[in-house]
Every structure is written in C-alpha cells, then in structure tokens.
C-alpha cells in the first residue's frame, strides 16, 4: 500500500476513503477549501473521469495497488453471467485485512492491514502475514495468544464488555 498525502486524496475523492477522513479536522479543512473560488472553475467531469474517480475511490478505500486491483478486475471478468461490480466488491471484502476491519478488531483498514502483516492474526490456527489473503465463509479468525496483551487489543476487550 502506498503512503502519501491522505488529506489531499480525501479532498479529491470525497470522505470515507481513509480513517483520517472521518475526523472533525478534515471536515473543517474541507469547508474552508470549498469557500475559495477560482478564476477558472472546473467543468463537468467526463464519463471517463467519473469512472476513474470511482476506481480510485475503491482502490484507496481497500488499500490495494493498481496491479492488485487490476488482477481482481480481471478475475471477476472471467466469470460469465454475473454482476461484475458486485463480484468485485465481494473479492475486495473477502481480503484478510478488510475482514479484520469489519470484525471490529481494528479501527481502520490501514491498522487492520498492519495487524495482519505483523502476524498478530491467526486464520484457521495459522499465522498469516498476507493482508490480501482470501477469507472463506467458514474460516476462523483469532488474535494470536502472544499478541493479546498488546495495547491495541486491550482497547478491544474493553469495547467487547
């Protein structure tokens, strides 16, 4: 996953792309930028421009690179007679880092990616360090016993109570 100017990307693509985009600081800075007017206002985006923005939004939201995203799209296109956009989101939602985020173990997708890549998460009893690992429906996801006393997971036990 590429690091870079998160606020600039959030302003361009809209909110809810990164965890930082959901803070009050971002909403305040966004309203200040909207007040400024330009001498040359931007025109209506083309169909291609809208598709590019949607692709970039999905790519940044799920923390994939261009190549990974392209591979997911190619994999989905091979399946005949299905809704490709729904299948693409199913593929992205079944990634290990996204499942850890959806379970509430991590507060953001980037933190979930870090927890998986540092080996704090067990999938079916095996330590997995690949954030893009595909999770199936009956897979068991646990926190590694040696990692349970970390500060990240202490908050989790308080939330669960």
Q: PLM features: what roles do these ranges have?
A:
Residues 1-103, 130-161:
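Ferredoxin-like alpha/beta domains used as RNA- or RNAP-binding modules
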């Amino acid at each position: 996953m590429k690091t870079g100017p998160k606020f600039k990307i959030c302003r361009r693509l809209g909110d809810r792309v990164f965890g930082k985009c959901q803070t009050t600081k971002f909403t305040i800075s966004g309203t200040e930028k909207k007040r400024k007017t330009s001498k040359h206002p931007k025109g209506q985006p083309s169909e291609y421009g809208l598709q590019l923005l949607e692709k970039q939004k999905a790519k940044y939201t799920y923390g994939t690179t261009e190549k990974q995203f392209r591979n997911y799209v190619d994999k989905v296109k091979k399946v005949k007679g299905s809704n490709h956009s729904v299948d693409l989101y199913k593929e992205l939602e079944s990634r290990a880092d996204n499942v850890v985020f959806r379970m509430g173990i991590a507060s953001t997708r980037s933190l979930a990616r870090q927890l998986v890549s540092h080996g704090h998460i067990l999938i079916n009893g095996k330590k997995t360090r690949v954030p893009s690992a595909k999770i199936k429906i009956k897979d068991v996801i646990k926190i590694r016993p040696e990692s349970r006393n970390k500060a990240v997971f202490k908050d989790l036990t308080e939330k669960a109570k």
